[in-house]
Swiss-Prot record:
Stretches for region Disordered: 1-36
Residues carrying ADP-ribosylserine: S7
Residues annotated with Omega-N-methylarginine modification: R87, R93
Residue positions, PTM N6-crotonyllysine: K6, K12, K13, K16, K17, K21, K24, K35
Residues carrying covalently attached carbohydrate according to the record: S113
Modified residues (N6-methyllysine): K47, K109
InterPro entries assigned: Histone-fold, Histone_H2A/H2B/H3, Histone_H2B, HISTONE_H2B_site
Modified residues (N6,N6-dimethyllysine): K58
N6-(beta-hydroxybutyryl)lysine PTM sites in chain numbering: K6, K12, K21, K35, K117
A molecular-function term among this protein's GO annotations: structural constituent of chromatin
Protein name from the UniProt record: Histone H2B type 1-K
Length: 126
């Protein structure tokens, strides 16, 4: 009776990591590229507002995307305002005006007051 065919030996558990941490020709390990995000800051705000609430990684991804989107909109609008007024520098005034233009009613008022408070705190700490 013929013996059952032997399957190929199973790959070792750590084999995939060895591929990602490949060494360069000069023997140094390749540095992983750092992915910047606002997750640390979103988490800090969440814990300040709702200390007993957590957040999933999917929700954190959505929050990160939201912050990036709002940042780009405000920066774009502030840039346009500076260009219209023939200025080469975006100041807190352009940011404030951009926020007033982009955010609706009460949300804009709160954002402006929080921004003013942050700028005051920053300048007094200098």
């Amino acid at each position: 009776m013929p013996e059952p065919a032997k399957s190929a030996p199973a790959p070792k558990k750590g084999s995939k990591k060895a591929v990602t941490k490949a060494q360069k020709k000069d023997g140094k390990k390749r540095k992983r590229s750092r992915k910047e995000s606002y997750s640390v800051y979103v988490y800090k705000v969440l814990k300040r507002v709702h200390p007993d609430t957590g957040i999933s990684s999917k929700a954190m991804g959505i929050m990160n995307s939201f912050v990036n989107d709002i940042f780009e909109r405000i920066a774009g609008e502030a840039s346009r305002l500076a260009h219209y007024n023939k200025r080469s520098t975006i100041t807190s005034r352009e940011i404030q005006t951009a926020v007033r233009l982009l955010l609706p009613g009460e949300l804009a008022k709160h954002a402006v007051s929080e921004g003013t408070k942050a700028v005051t705190k920053y300048t007094s700490a200098k």
